[in-house]
A protein has these predicted regions:
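Internal maturation/activation junctions in enzymes
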Residues: 317-425, 576
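Bacterial N-terminal signal peptides
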Residues: 11-23
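Bacterial N-terminal signal peptides that target proteins for export
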Residues: 2-14
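Short, small/polar residue-rich loop motifs at catalytic or cofactor-binding pockets
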Residues: 282, 404-407, 471-473
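Extended C-terminal subregions enriched in glycine
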Residues: 416, 466-468, 500, 509-556
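Active-site rim segments in enzyme catalytic domains, especially the processed small/beta chain
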Residues: 88-95, 99-114, 131, 266-271, ...
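Noncatalytic scaffold domains of N-terminal-nucleophile
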Residues: 30-63, 67, 75-243, 247-249, ...
Length: 586
């Protein structure tokens, strides 16, 4: 069984959960602010195992995945079972009505690949989807709740394809645990109860959603209550009988479309054709050589691997190892590298099936030139997009869209050495708040830029029919000598990129074990202001960073990093102390 090594993180006090903020500047989609509050901080212990390991954001889901792995299931099998459970016990973060990105290592073929199951804009969507009759961007709250923001879900299609390719156990056996849990009821966790209370107004807007998440006395479901979801159980029974494709070709798909159009206060344009024609796209991993490792992740429409790769590539020109994690100068360099990477992200990164993108964003000479813009000990005055190599350059405008994901991450390694890193989402907390067949529908389309043009130039991440919105999700597998060394990822809006970069630097540069790296206080700089994690030793960086010329804020940081590391043939795992996650293995 699993063994644990105790390690106490550098947290001073436990921050309180914060309510989601829905007051955003017009013209922004949902990227800078993350709606899912951090849970009270907990002390987490490094987990040890020999044969297999799983790390998820919810203990119930982790136990279900563990049981699948224990029974001989593959990493893909375990993910299928876990995702079905998360859609029930963590509905604010992911589910059947959302999308995901997966990085998968096939041990038999020694092959690393990625799968894009991002939600997709309807064929009837126009660049004016989130603009009023005068062409002005809608306020975020006016866009997110209802049918307008719903894209074609991709998660169920991903589950089916992963099982078809990599599954070992019968499909119906993987859906059975979540089906039973939905029938018998699960215990509402403190985190879910807090999210329900924070989202009370939006959840009360539609009768079906209100009936499920509210008690008869008008209060939201409380921690410790047992909550049954019979429609969800019926959905899983149908999927277990007819397969994943039936979600798209049968009654469920038709009812998703009806629900989107039936939200008469904010209807969408999703069609039956959008549902039936959805495809998961297998894409080549984006990899960056770093300190003897290959850091690999998801390419566009995710900006994750490119932006994380740029941060690492720029910081590699400084001796972070010598500086160490307590050095304000080290964090200044990481922060300015992040600002430069985010500048390129805002200018260039989007769905490359629709817009051309520079080929040289991870070119070694380009990153070396970007690193020369950074002066240790002095804040970079401005971070402008660079001029990487192009094949077919076009003039794009900077995008200030914001990503507001309520998201979850799963890391799994099975006994055969197969590994999967999946970040899964419905975007905002509880998505669009529309509910059908026991699950919530995403609001993923608000990850597009609400504006189409800026200063007469097109924005790469603008709405277009059939396009997939840009994401910051960064599921990562670090390879060493051709085999997985680290499996990691996180939720958290566009801060995901900083959370993952921090964890990689902490393990690969500073020699921390995976739990220490995850628990390391968060310090993030995306757009010029340093954000330091409240109640942790990161606050000690405030004065030194201000002296360097930065504006600094202190706030709760809602990462949910789940990671597994392989050292000397042994599996070690970590879960984020800011959430309810659990690592299990044998």
């Amino acid at each position: 069984m699993i063994k644990r090594t105790h390690w106490r993180p550098l947290f001073i006090i436990a921050p309180l959960c914060l309510a989601s903020s829905l007051t955003l500047a017009t013209g922004q989609a949902a990227d800078s602010v993350a709606p899912e509050a951090a849970s009270a901080l907990q002390t987490k212990k490094l987990a040890h195992a020999q044969h297999f390991m799983i790390s998820t954001a919810n203990p119930v889901a982790s136990k279900i995945g563990y049981d699948i792995l224990k029974a001989g299931g593959s990493a893909a099998d375990a993910y299928v079972a876990v995702q079905m459970a998360l859609g029930l016990v963590e509905p604010q973060s992911s589910g059947l009505g959302g999308g995901a990105f997966a990085v998968y290592y096939d041990a038999k073929k020694h092959k690393l690949t990625t799968f894009d199951a991002r939600e997709t804009a309807p064929l009837e969507a126009t660049p004016e989807l989130f603009q009023d009759s005068n062409g002005k961007p809608l306020k975020f709250y006016d866009a997110v709740v209802g049918g307008r923001s719903v894209g074609t879900p991709g998660t169920v299609k991903l589950l089916g394809e992963l099982h078809d390719r990599y599954g070992e156990m019968p499909w119906k056996d993987l859906l059975a645990p979540a089906t039973t849990l939905a029938q018998d009821g699960f215990i509402v966790s403190p985190r879910l109860a807090g999210e329900l209370a924070d989202s009370k107004k939006s959840l009360a807007r539609y009768p079906q959603t209100k009936a499920y998440f509210f008690n008869p006395d008008g209060t939201t479901r409380q921690a410790g209550q047992r909550l049954k979801n019979i429609p969800y159980a019926e959905t899983l029974l149908m999927l277990s009988t007819y397969g994943a494709d039936s979600f798209y070709t049968g009654q469920i798909g038709k009812d998703i479309v009806s629900k989107v159009h039936g939200a008469t206060d904010n209807p969408g344009v999703l069609s039956d054709k959008d549902i039936t024609s959805y495809k998961v796209k297998e894409r080549t991993p984006v990899c960056l050589p770093y300190k003897g490792y290959d850091v690999c992740g998801m390419g566009p429409p995710s900006s994750g691997a490119l932006t994380v790769g740029q941060i690492l590539g720029i910081t590699s020109h400084f001796d972070l190892t010598k500086m160490g994690p307590k050095s304000p100068e080290a964090w200044q360099i990481i922060g300015d590298a992040s600002r430069l990477a985010f500048a390129d992200r805002g200018r260039y990164m989007a769905d490359t099936d629709f817009v051309p993108m520079p080929q040289g964003l991870l070119d070694a000479d380009y990153l070396k030139a970007r690193a020369k813009l950074i002066t240790p000990g002095k804040a970079l005055k401005t971070a402008e997009p660079g001029n990487p190599a192009w094949r077919h350059p076009i003039a794009e405008a900077d995008d200030q869209s914001i990503e507001f994901p309520c998201t979850s991450h799963i890391s799994i390694i099975d006994k055969e050495g197969n590994a999967i890193s999946v970040t899964t989402t419905i975007e905002h907390g509880f998505g669009s708040t529309l509910m059908t067949h026991g699950f919530l529908l995403n609001n993923e389309l608000t990850d597009f830029s609400f504006k189409s043009y800026q200063d007469g130039r097109p924005i790469a991440n603008r709405v277009e029919p059939g396009k997939r919105p840009r994401s910051s999700m960064s599921p990562t597998i670090v390879m060493k000598e051709g085999k997985p060394y680290l499996v990691v990822g996180s939720p958290g809006g566009s801060r995901i990129i900083g959370y993952v970069a921090k964890t990689l630097i902490a393990t690969l540069d500073w020699g921390m074990n995976i739990q220490q790296a995850i628990s390391l206080p968060n310090s993030v700089n995306r757009f010029g202001k340093f954000e330091l994690e409240k109640g942790t030793s990161a606050v000690q960086l405030k004065q030194p960073l201000e002296k360097m010329g930065f504006k600094v804020s202190v706030s709760d940081m809602n990462s949910g990093i789940q990671g597994i590391e392989i050292r000397n043939g042994q599996l070690t795992g970590g879960a984020d102390p800011r959430r309810e996650g659990l690592v299990l293995g044998d």
